[in-house]
UniProtKB/Swiss-Prot annotation:
Gene that produces this protein: RPL44
Domain of life (superkingdom): Eukaryota
Leftover remarks: Cycloheximide sensitive type.
Any one GO molecular-function label of the UniProt entry: structural constituent of ribosome
One cellular component (GO) term of this entry: cytosolic large ribosomal subunit
Family indicated by similarity: Belongs to the eukaryotic ribosomal protein eL42 family.
Name this polypeptide is given: Large ribosomal subunit protein eL42
Annotated spans, Disordered: 1-56
Keywords in alphabetical order: Antibiotic resistance, Cycloheximide resistance, Ribonucleoprotein, Ribosomal protein
Residue ranges with Basic residues bias: 1-29
Gene Ontology process terms (BP): response to antibiotic; response to cycloheximide; translation
Amino acid sequence: MVNIPKTRRTYCKGKACRKHTPHKVTQYKKGKDSLSAQGKRRYDRKQSGYGGQTKPVFHKKAKTTKKVVLRLECTVCKTKHQLALKRCKHFELGGDKKQRGAAISF
């Protein structure tokens, strides 16, 4: 279980800052695939008409987790940069902190 706070003081590369400032932390999410990308246009053209599936469908999945990517936004100049963490099964953003000597509950 990885628990990351919602704010973090870290270095800002923005031209206005170039120093340590508070950053707002969010989790990176993949955007929607563009229908006008060259590969998608080619694939759709190839798929149309008779002949079934024309390219191999990938089945040999090897990884069980994805790397968590944090999106850090500077609260001063609004510059954004990304930071990759290690792989983990459970990721939490801004969850409760662990208490010393507290009983474990599931």
